Curated annotation (Swiss-Prot):
<feature type="modified residue" description="Phosphoserine">
    <location>
        <position position="857"/>
    </location>
</feature>
<comment type="subunit">
    <text>Associates with the SIT4 protein phosphatase catalytic subunit in a cell-cycle-dependent manner.</text>
</comment>
<feature type="region of interest" description="Disordered">
    <location>
        <begin position="768"/>
        <end position="1033"/>
    </location>
</feature>
<keyword id="KW-0597">Phosphoprotein</keyword>
<feature type="compositionally biased region" description="Acidic residues">
    <location>
        <begin position="171"/>
        <end position="182"/>
    </location>
</feature>
<feature type="compositionally biased region" description="Basic and acidic residues">
    <location>
        <begin position="183"/>
        <end position="195"/>
    </location>
</feature>
<feature type="compositionally biased region" description="Acidic residues">
    <location>
        <begin position="825"/>
        <end position="838"/>
    </location>
</feature>
<keyword id="KW-0963">Cytoplasm</keyword>
<feature type="modified residue" description="Phosphoserine">
    <location>
        <position position="774"/>
    </location>
</feature>
<feature type="compositionally biased region" description="Acidic residues">
    <location>
        <begin position="784"/>
        <end position="793"/>
    </location>
</feature>
<dbReference type="GO" id="GO:0031929">
    <property type="term" value="P:TOR signaling"/>
</dbReference>
<keyword id="KW-0131">Cell cycle</keyword>
<feature type="modified residue" description="Phosphoserine">
    <location>
        <position position="991"/>
    </location>
</feature>
<feature type="modified residue" description="Phosphoserine">
    <location>
        <position position="892"/>
    </location>
</feature>
<feature type="compositionally biased region" description="Basic and acidic residues">
    <location>
        <begin position="858"/>
        <end position="879"/>
    </location>
</feature>
<dbReference type="Pfam" id="PF04499">
    <property type="entry name" value="SAPS"/>
</dbReference>
<feature type="region of interest" description="Disordered">
    <location>
        <begin position="32"/>
        <end position="82"/>
    </location>
</feature>
Amino acid sequence: MSGSFWKFGQDYSIESPVSKILNSAFIKINKDQDDDVPTGTCEENIADDEDNSSHDYAASEDNVVNENEEKEEENTLPTTESEYENYRPNLDVLDDLLDDDELYTELMCSNFKLLIFLKYPDVLSKLIEYVTNEKILDEETDSAKKPEIIEGVNDHPILIERDRKDKKEDAEEGGDSEETTNDSDHDSGDERSVDSEETSITLPPESEEQVETRRARIAAEILSADVWPISAAIMQNKDLLGRLWSILDHPAPLPIPASTYFMKINERLLDMDITGMLEFILSRDSLVARFLTHVDNPSLMDFLLKVISTDKPDSPTGVIKILKSQELIPKLLDHLNPEYGISTQSAAGDFIKAFVTLSTNSSNELASGIGPNELTRQLVSEEMIEKLIKIMLKGGTSLSNGVGIIIELIRKNNSDYDFIQLVYTTLESHPPTDRDPIHLIHLVKLFAKHMPDFADMLDKTKLPLMEMPFGNIEPLGFERFKICELIAELLHCSNMTLLNEPNGEMIAQERDIERAKELETSTEKENITAIVDNKSSYYDKDCVEKDITENLGALQINNQGSEEDELNDTGVSSVKLDVKSDAKVVEGLENDASGVELYDETLSDTESVRECLREKPLVGDRLKIALEDTKILISILDMFTEFPWNNFLHNVIFDIAQQIFNGPLKTGYNRFLLKDYLVDAYLTKKIVDADKACQDYEKKTGLRYGYMGHLTLVAEEISKFKEYIDEMKLTFCNTAVSDRLEEPFWKEYSETILADTREKYNTVLGDFGNDQESDDDVIRNSDSEDIIGDTEGNENYGNGENDELLSNGHDSGNMDLYYNFNNNENEENEEDYAEYSDVDNKNYYNNVETNDDDYDSDDGKSKSAESEFTDKISEHRDGNSLYNEDNDENGSDKWTSGTSLFPPDHFPSRSQPSDPKLQDQNIFHHQFDFEGVGDDDDYMDPNDDGQSYARPGNPLYTTPKTPPRPKTILFNSLSALDNNGEDEEVALGTSVDDRMDNEISSDEEDSEDEDEENDMGNEEGYSLYRSRSKEAF
């Protein structure tokens, strides 16, 4: 067994090492005597037996007695859990269990004795002691320990020898304790011990700290294991939880292993018994302060987020109210100050952003968030936003983290996506609750107030030059970029509907006041009582269901009454409004019908309108007015060309421009920002100058500036804006904007450079068909024009005047057209398939009049033209060498005669064999002759889909020397002409119906002459040959 990977013996009756340790893990409690008798060991009993017995017993008899006594004592261990009440755990064996590699495996396999042993409070207390050991809490990083260990091994080689002796002594002790095993096990054990001694020479000795770290890790794995008995035993002893939570009282920084153990154990307990665990957590004093001491510890803060996520709208737990009462949000904002370290500031900012994401206002019922709550409402309150802005103005990491928080707040709390819009609610119909969506009115107002401070910070920030391979450049810097990003996001926020409603701010304030009055009545004691009630209801589901049913019934009755009242109150007025609005629409339509332009409107952008909007500005307009007064948008626009290589900045500037040009024009202050962008900033001139500067730079260095992509996008926004106002027939009272858009240099740029760039952007990658026309395309176009021209205008077509032209210039595109027309005679749109068969053929675009769908009114004319075209092609083919009786009689090569139909420029002719005799031989001729094979054979090709092969007859037993001859109108007509010798029977004016009659007659003649043709060895048979497709030529 020494060379086998299987480490267990073949005898399945042998116990595992864990089971052997557990045999001595229980001590029976003797109620009559004060002494406790261990059940798993019999050392004291053996000593008494040796004193009372004679010294003449043999050693073998003593061993047998010891074995029998051990087996009897093992059998005395209880088999049920209730019987273990008379036993206490032997804590001396706990270290041996933790050192065993199979402990966790035995635990997950539900080892009965192991579960009973680990459930004892004393054992659990010892495991928690391992996790909360001061050496674990104070341990240094592994990187600082490893050099000391290696250095100690090199300086003190005696440690290795001592370790070897210790292992030998352990091996001898292990051998004495396992005397009952067989000899083979002894041999394998000796070999393994020798191997372990040899390998231990190269390994450093395990220090005491490493042993304790390993045992702490195993103890944490046991306490966090998915084993119900252990978790339930911990929850029944609150003192154990209190000792575990003492980790939070340790001064920062807390080692990552200790915090990881804490998080794993508590998450398991929280999932197992959420009510009991929350009751314990909320009963802790200064919960927020203890967590914020370790705010830069990700494991602890993640666990706090998980605790917060348990407080959902449909099942509140009171966690949010407790955290608000302990001022979680103000204390987190304090940690953003520069007086804290950069890591602490970033950790606090990341926690706030994660909490905002968790509190997303989403109408999706499947969302895992908790929705808006009092903590996020406190975060966007006037006091907290003012505090955050003052911290951000200090610059550095504080500004960066603050901008990230503001962006997350705006993106996750867009009032336009609220399930119920605030402006359509009343205090009676929708009473305010602590779960109402939050509004960003205070946020926008305060940033509008402090906009000059951010503008000064943007202008005053200067950084030293940075060396680059193409020269020295000034870096943008993190602060300036974050300010630009903040302005773009605030501009997004100012366009929300709620912030541009006249009564929006007033409605929000009324609801905030009413909500504050209701929340003042609640206290922390009531919250804890609610948690206890939830715990009791957890075990009494019937009562809960009954109460919920009664409450739902009452709510339904109340809702029905309130809805009826609302209908009674608002029904008449809504009907009146609808009638008035309909009347206005009708009146507008009448005016439009009488000649009045519906979209002929004038935009009021005069100074009087500007002053009127400034007197009583809405919340959204207040921010736009601040942006205009500080000229911060123009400063950001000037940075576009100052930092030509910063694409992050260019993307932000394009975002700002896109919002301005797509913003409202008839209402609000956005029209004046648009005027500033086009008139004051002279945006069109900046774009043209930037493009010219890039061209000059490219001539000098061969490089293009990095802003060219976003420059084109901004120019496209201006172009789309001009198209919009032209289409809607909008005009400005102040013609400055229109004048900027009508300037000659901008028109020239739009019609030349911008149009060319747009065309390049819209071109499919690798599609050069429109730019480069091959010679083959030229030949095909000229040939198709000649043929169609002859077909339409030459009355002598087919009489031999143009035979030479057709035989030499017949291109593959028209051949495709010809074959597709005949093969798809039963389909509805023959010409569509024919034209589409060759994408490169420009007849598809130039000769659209040949399609039936395009000229339904002239259907008869198009049909006759098709028939005339088919007849003329047929006569032309009769005059050439597709099938010639003279060639057949002379035994000439039908391949060479058949290929004369195709242009030599496109299709290589077949090389002639060196031996002339091979020309007359069929190289595909089978060695056996098959008789009785004809058109009447019922052979079915299993791979035939009915379209891939063109075969009217049997394809496998005919010679494939001739080109494919599909059974179509043309070739049936040709076959009839060849067999009957009547070359002049097909007239130019034959219709399609007449052709069908000829086809039927030619089919009968083909079947009668088939045997004769096969005997003559001609090539009128049909080969296994693919029909022509658009790739054939």
